[in-house]
Amino acid sequence: MLFLCRASPLLQRTALSSPLRFFAPPKSSFNRTFANTAVRLSIEMETVDTSERLVQLRELMKRNNLDVYIVPSEDSHQSEYIAHCDARREFISGFTGSAGTAVISSTAAALSTDGRYFNQAAKQLDSNWTLLKRGLEGVPTWQEWTTEQAEGGKTVGVDPSVITAASARKLSETLEKSGSKLIGIEQNLVDQIWGDKRPARPNETVKIHPAEYAGKPFQEKIADLRKELKTKKRAGFIVSVLDEIAWLFNLRGNDIPYNPVFFSYAVITPETVDLYINDEKLSPEVKAHLGSDVVVKPYESIFADARALSVNAPLTENGSPMKYLTSNKASWALSLSFGGEKKLDEARSPISDAKAIKNEVELKGMRNCHIRDGAALSEYFAWLENELINKKSTLDEVDGADKLEQIRSKHDKFVGLSFDTISSTGPNAAVIHYKPEKGICSVIDPNAIYLCDSGGQYLDGTTDTTRTFHFGTPTEMEKKAFTLVLKGLIALDTAVFPKGTSGFALDALARQHLWRYGLDYLHGTGHGVGAYLNVHEGPIGVGTRIQYSEVSLSPGNVISDEPGYYEDGKFGIRIENIIMAREVETPYKFGEKSWLGFEHVTMTPIGQNLIETSLLSEEERQWVNNYHAEVWEKTSGYFKQDELTLNWLKKETKPLK
């Protein structure tokens, strides 16, 4: 049974503490890359003592008759990357990764996360926590762990604004089978513990994203959405996902680091357009851009309006109330305000689908910004090699990241970074989403692997590039692993497939060469990329997530191609290009279908001294040479007055023999 209740004031209670535990299968049943649960890093990640926070949380749970409390990572809009004020899971657990769910019972606490963060979580969680390594055989999901903790008719609570309605229903149904129940706690318990130390909610001003970059007026996008509503016979669409609102209205914001979005909701009906946003965020220019047809309402009033819309829904031909359409990412709180499933149709958002197919203006912008970004990366790697090898300079990982940002910022249309730069040397490169911090990060070792995953936000597009270099002499294993990863990148880059194929179906192409050696990587092969929007964009992707099988790739999709390989405590390798799906000509057209392939837009050299050429086929060797010739042609013009970078680029793009 699903219902909403209000939380009670904070009380105090004693917490139980136990050593950090791992749910992990025997070594033989998963990739040896992560066989050792002990984390061997050359830096010390900070571990936060969460004992007192858990004491306070359990007091609140007791006061509200809760036996288990769930703390997801997401905010009220189900954002992957969140504002600091919404980092509740990080606050309660000490784990800073972008993905994971914390579950706290009266006697235990668990944190579930995916393979990108196994090492990081193991280092950051203190002894109060059990780490659930998601996706490994024999490891319970956070839902299963919650159900175990709630056995015997216990009550589980969650803030309904930070969990989707679909997830809440599914968990509730599972709990009810054992006599337990899920309830919504409207006032977030972690917020009460955080108190006045919780960061303020951002309220940054919104800017217009002009048609010269957007490629389509927002009025046309709304007209297209209304056609969808007519086809589906729905009363309106409730928009709660932030990048969908930014894209729909051709606006950009700055409320979440690295993601140009702003806190808002929207309701689109056949006759009206309501934008729920704090008025002070809108300049006169933005209000003029929106025009008189867009009614601006206070951000928080969406919930009261939802109830009114539900009660006054238009009628169908048979006299029954029409349903509203909303994304399957909409929060449980929003769903409850509308009256739940009876009043709402939850589905993959048509805005998400439309946003993922870039128009020609957006595609041109993505090509252009990647050329500028590629030039910035070449300048950085040339500088870094010179500093390490010729000048014998001592540079740490943050020094490198800061220098790269400085170089990027010189380029036209640069707005900021698209995510925290992953500047990692040696064993730190094996931490997939590693974040160096000044004072505790490592000095870059010229005799070890250096992995740099970085990206920029430009007015005309978003970039995301990973390159792995070795400025000394790589080992035989490092060269073999790098080359197998490169072969996987080429396999996806050169794939030709019938229209209607999903990224789920293509994932094995990038892994096949590693698989032949019994190797693999525990992250997806590719994710969608926004156009001056979120660097991680759905609904498309290449990987084993089941949702990737539910949507096929289409011309205009922009995704990453980023296979990798990681040896815990030794090194990590990843090569990442951004590729765009497009129609291609084939000698035959079986079934009269259209056939698709990819165009790569990333223009940065691939570390040649890590390539074991004997492992490449002639076609793969030619691909590398053609790619490097293209990089030289498109970026060398930036270095007419920069002899250092020009010479480095010439060296790194010379043909393989």
Curated annotation (Swiss-Prot):
Keywords: Aminopeptidase, Hydrolase, Manganese, Metal-binding, Metalloprotease, Protease. GO terms for molecular function: metal ion binding; metalloaminopeptidase activity. CDD domains: APP (cd01085). Binds 2 manganese ions per subunit. Mn(2+) 2 binds at residues 453, 464, 576. Gene3D superfamilies: Creatinase/methionine aminopeptidase superfamily (3.90.230.10), Creatinase/prolidase N-terminal domain (3.40.350.10). Its EC number is 3.4.11.9. Mn(2+) 1 binds at residues 464, 562, 576. Transmembrane segments: none annotated. GO terms for biological process: proteolysis. InterPro entries: Creatin/AminoP/Spt16_N, Creatinase/aminopeptidase-like, Creatinase_N, Pept_M24, Pept_M24B, Peptidase_M24_C, X-Pro_aminopeptidase_P. Its cofactor is Mn(2+). GO terms for cellular component: cytoplasm. It catalyses: Release of any N-terminal amino acid, including proline, that is linked to proline, even from a dipeptide or tripeptide. Catalyzes the removal of a penultimate prolyl residue from the N-termini of peptides. Belongs to the peptidase M24B family. This is Probable Xaa-Pro aminopeptidase P.
